[in-house]
Swiss-Prot record:
Subunit composition and interactions: Homodimer.
Gene this chain is encoded by: thrS
InterPro entries: aa-tRNA-synt_IIb (IPR002314), aa-tRNA-synth_II (IPR006195), aa-tRNA-synth_II/BPL/LPL (IPR045864), Anticodon-bd (IPR004154), Anticodon-bd_dom_sf (IPR036621), Beta-grasp_dom_sf (IPR012675), TGS (IPR004095), TGS-like (IPR012676)
Annotated EC: 6.1.1.3
Organism in which the protein naturally occurs: Prochlorococcus marinus (strain MIT 9515)
One GO molecular-function entry: ATP binding
Cellular localisation: Cytoplasm
Protein's recorded name: Threonine--tRNA ligase
Length: 638
């Protein structure tokens, strides 16, 4: 007689083993109809599996986050059901849930096309309209092997081989189709309505290029039609803003096969990069950072001593010369400690803030590379603060102000903050962990900031705070971080002389604001849709001549603007002015200055903004003042 305790404290006693669906029916028909699964003693559980013991039960519906994930996982199995009906000889690999959707990896000699995707989607629609029950079978390992041997599902058999003999395996029956999964899944396909298959891509079994090549079908699914519609609109908008497309269209950068994951910056893109670097350099100078430059290639002995060789060897690019092995640096921290170690340091020298625009290389898998967002060569706005335990809170507090100043400058006003605390495996005393976590917590609380705790998610060498941006499409980008490190200064013999004339190891704070220039520029391209604010725009103003009579004046104005330090261009082609305006607008130039007979006579320009609004006639001195005002505002939105 299991006693079931519901979230509101209500207790229900049943004569025999009971399912989540039975519990829902005992409450009401409407709830039973909406039930997708249960959470039994905090573990997700299929709605039709029996609960035999006293348990705390939460009924999961499509309104719950877990409910949406279960819907998506069930749709992945529907891909298998549909594809096996259309192409019986294909082999199913894995079909997990991912953010906002799901995918299924499939082995097939036949190459799927976009037309096949439409056909598969139509078949899924036919299947879900049948409202059939999804049956869950709990079987032994041997029974599972027998089931998938009969179906010649070689990838399922490989997965089963890794499962312990004692563990039971969940099989899910969609009519004639059988799949396996930890579950849970929906009890009936009536819960599966709002979905879309999105795209095809290639993959490898277990993500290893030495294994079989697979085809991946991506999809998304939601509990409501309006949520699906909104998501598809967001995808469409994201594709429009894709930094790879805009980078090519506006000649900002490119990547080519001969140098995967490494950026060829074009003049327009390099201007943005240099402006960003100049801005961060000014911020660092105002905050008393000392800029340094350290080598690209460093003998492996330093990486062995720092611990990176053991942990990150496979992610490093290496080279050899004169019987020595060098690693191209994947991060800057060990080199910054070498600079700190030059000369005796006193407590009076702390905090010491060393900054570098450090070019790093990491051998990321080729399949993970993605435009500017995931590269193999990147530049960090990296700095390391050497300080005492007592100085941690003040340094963290100052850095938080710095992060908000920079992000607000670019128009980002929603910043998500997460504090990660001590993991199970860690170095350092409990006392220093206590002090560090308290310092980070106090720094956040003293600023009345909203933040999220991530217990156990800190690095083995110290706690950290992560800062993420929310962009115009509500996507989250983790950029900034400040991380306490008790370990590396000790490993690399960094010391200072304290007030008692004793040698001590400093605490090192790893910190970055942008994360990497490449990724941050990628975020900016998509955030602004390449309509950069005037301070960042590769071309700030373009002057258009109306007739040949105005060409000389156009050139004169352009020379004056460039002499003053503005980034100005001219279009003096023998084309209609409307055509020139359209071309300049498509090029995303913030200001368009028109020079005709009237403007020539008044020694002025008629100014248009990128959005098409007419700003009026400006004499050059007033134009300079306007541009200065706009440039000073940077990316802020008034």
């Amino acid at each position: 007689m299991p006693k079931i305790t519901l979230p509101d404290g209500t207790k229900k006693v049943f004569e025999k083993a009971v399912t989540t669906l039975d519990i829902a029916k005992s409450i009401g028909a409407g709830l039973a109809k909406a039930t997708i699964a249960g959470k039994v003693n905090n573990v997700l559980f299929d709605a039709t599996l029996p609960i035999k013991n006293d348990s705390k039960v939460v009924i999961i519906t499509s309104r719950d986050k877990e409910g949406i994930e279960i819907i998506r996982h069930s749709f992945a199995h529907l891909i298998g059901h549909a594809v096996k009906q259309i192409y019986p000889n294909i082999k199913m690999a894995i079909g997990p849930v991912i953010e906002d959707g799901f995918y299924y990896d499939i082995f097939s000699e036949y190459r799927f096309t976009p037309e096949d995707l439409i056909k598969i989607e139509e078949r899924i629609n036919q299947l879900i309209r049948k409202d059939y029950d999804v049956e869950v079978l709990q079987v032994s390992k041997q029974e599972a092997i027998k089931t998938f041997k009969e179906r010649d599902e070689i990838f399922k058999l490989r997965i089963i081989e890794e499962i312990d003999e004692k563990d039971s395996i969940n099989l899910y029956k969609h009519e004639e189709y059988i799949d396996m999964c930890r579950g849970p899944h929906v009890p009936n396909t009536r819960h599966l309505r709002h979905f879309k298959l999105l795209k095809l891509s290639g993959s490898y079994w277990r993500g290893d290029s030495k294994n079989e090549s697979l085809q991946r079908i991506y999809g998304t699914a939601w509990s409501k039609e309006k949520d699906l519609t909104n998501y598809l609109k967001r995808i469409e908008e994201a594709e429009k803003r894709d930094h790879r497309k805009l980078g090519k269209k506006h000649s900002l950068f490119h990547i080519q096969e001969e140098s995967p994951g490494m950026i060829f910056w074009h003049p327009n893109g390099w201007i943005i990069y240099q402006i960003l670097e100049k801005y961060i350099r000014e911020i660092l100078r105002k905050n008393e950072y000392l800029e340094i430059k350290t080598p690209q290639a460093v003998d492996k002995s330093l990486w062995e001593k720092s611990g990176h060789w053991e942990k990150f060897r496979d992610d490093m690019f290496t080279t050899a010369s004169e019987n020595r092995t060098y690693a191209i640096k994947p991060m800057n921290c060990p080199c910054h400690i070498q600079v700190f170690n030059q000369g005796l340091k006193s407590y009076k020298d702390l905090p010491l803030r060393l900054a570098e625009f450090g070019s790093c290389h990491r051998n990321e898998p080729s399949g993970a590379l993605h435009g500017l967002m995931r590269v193999r060569n990147f530049t960090q706005d990296d700095a390391h603060i050497f300080c005492t335990e007592e100085q941690i809170q003040e340094e963290v507090s100052t850095f938080i102000d710095l992060v908000f100043e920079v992000y607000n400058t670019f128009g980002f006003d929603e910043i998500i903050i997460k504090l990660s605390t001590r993991p199970e495996k860690r170095v350092g005393s409990e006392d220093i962990w206590d002090k560090s976590e308290e310092a980070l917590t106090e720094a956040l609380n003293n600023k009345n900031l909203k933040w999220e705790l991530q217990p156990g998610e800190g690095a083995f060498y110290g706690p950290k705070i992560e800062f993420s941006l929310k962009d115009c499409l509500n996507r989250i980008w983790q950029c900034g971080t400040i991380q306490v490190d008790f370990s590396m200064p000790v490993r690399l013999d960094a010391t200072f002389v304290d007030i008692n004339n004793e040698k001590k190891s400093p605490v090192m704070l790893h910190r970055a604001i942008l994360g990497s220039f490449e990724r941050f520029i990628g975020i900016l391209i998509e955030q602004y849709e390449a309509k950069f604010p005037i301070w960042l725009a590769p071309t700030q103003i373009i002057l258009l001549s109306i007739t040949e009579r105005n060409i000389k004046k156009c050139i004169e104005f352009n020379n004056l603007l460039n002499t003053k330090g503005y980034r100005s261009k001219i279009d003096i082609r023998n084309e209609k002015i409307g055509y020139k305006i359209r071309e300049s607008t498509l090029a995303r130039i913030p200001l368009i200055g028109i020079v005709g007979d009237k403007e020539q006579e008044l020694n002025s320009v008629t100014l248009r903004a990128l959005d098409g609004s007419n700003l009026g006639i400006y004499e050059l001195d007033n134009l300079f003042k306007l541009m200065n005002t706009l440039i000073e505002k940077k990316g802020r939105v008034d």
